[in-house]
Amino acid sequence: MVQKAEIKLWSTNVESLNQVVEQIKAIAKKTGVRMRGPIPLPTRRLIVPTLKLPHGEGSKKWDKWELRIHKRLVILDADERVIRQIMRVRVPEDVYIEIRLR
């Protein structure tokens, strides 16, 4: 039975996230490893309402600030040389990666 590697990526910047996913896809294609994904997972929206007026008197006016966290899942056959190449991929500061072997 072949071991699988689940690579979960998340970021607030969708362009840099897709860039890292494309690098992983290129590695999988170059080495001939079977790959599933990238599977887009649900985007998490964090909304923070803040009161515009500092003293709280008068009519209540609110600002809403939103942060979106985009997620992707890639599943690969866990070959040792492929995992080493993925570990060498340049990852921007705003992209987070979690690799789980199954």
Swiss-Prot record:
What's a GO cellular component annotated to this UniProt protein? small ribosomal subunit
Record flagged with keyword Transferase: no
Source domain of life is: Archaea
Tell me yes or no: is Ribosomal protein among this UniProt entry's keywords: yes
What GO biological process terms are annotated to this protein in UniProt? translation
Q: Which UniProt keywords apply?
A: Ribonucleoprotein, Ribosomal protein
Pfam families, per the entry = Ribosomal_S10 (PF00338)
List the PROSITE patterns: RIBOSOMAL_S10
Q: Which Gene3D superfamilies match?
A: Ribosomal protein S10 domain
List GO molecular-function terms, semicolon-separated: structural constituent of ribosome; tRNA binding
Subunit annotation: Part of the 30S ribosomal subunit.
Q: What is stated as this protein's family in its record?
A: Belongs to the universal ribosomal protein uS10 family.
Q: What does this protein do?
A: Involved in the binding of tRNA to the ribosomes.
Q: Could you tell me what this protein is called?
A: Small ribosomal subunit protein uS10
Q: What is the lineage of its organism?
A: Archaea, Thermoproteota, Thermoprotei, Desulfurococcales, Pyrodictiaceae
